[in-house]
């Protein structure tokens, strides 16, 4: 179910969101690893059996990755980039839709940006910024 986050709600949800993000990132990295193994297999061996095993592993890893994305998105966050570690929490500032933003490695939500400005438009959340719902 969709809802807007206050800064406090986003920070309260963050530990669980980080855990789910890191799981999705691990699944993404697993896909990359298997893809590299598959490329090596294709270029260095003629083993159809090895190719099929790797292909099945890749298919399974892709399925798990998409499941992890669904689980992460079920928290209400918007995934901007798994690779760059960027997530947005939908929020409102006065009556304008904005995003509270998080980058992998940050321990709390400290920034927001207009809906269309993205990461480069990040602005710090003021300590008593009551304009954010």
Q: For each of these PLM feature ranges, what is it?
A:
Residues 24, 28, 45, 76-79:
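Short secondary-structure junctions and interdomain/linker hinges
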Residues 1-8, 62, 126-133:
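Short, charge-rich amphipathic segments
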Residues 19-30, 35, 49, 56, ...:
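Generic alpha-helical propensity signal that fires on short helical segments
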Residues 21, 28, 62-65, 69:
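A structural signal for well-ordered alpha-helices, especially hydrophobic packing surfaces
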Residues 71-133:
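Glycine-rich, aromatic-bearing surface loops/beta-hairpins
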Residues 1-41:
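Long, hydrophobic N-terminal alpha-helical segment
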Residues 34-61, 66:
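Structured domain cores in non-transmembrane regions
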Residues 3-4, 66, 94:
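A generic "functional-site adjacency" signal
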């Amino acid at each position: 179910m969709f809802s807007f986050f206050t800064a406090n709600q986003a920070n309260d949800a963050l530990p669980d969101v980080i855990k789910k993000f890191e799981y999705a990132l691990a699944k993404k990295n697993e896909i990359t690893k298997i893809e590299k193994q598959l490329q090596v297999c294709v270029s260095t061996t003629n083993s159809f059996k090895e190719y099929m095993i790797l292909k099945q592993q890749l298919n399974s890893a892709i399925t798990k990755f998409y499941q992890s994305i669904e689980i992460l998105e079920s928290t209400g966050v918007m995934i901007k980039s798994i690779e760059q570690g960027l997530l947005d929490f939908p929020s409102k500032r006065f009556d304008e839709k904005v995003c509270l933003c998080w980058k992998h490695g940050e321990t709390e939500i400290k920034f927001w940006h207009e809906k269309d400005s993205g990461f480069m438009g990040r602005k710090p959340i003021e300590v008593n910024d009551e304009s954010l719902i």
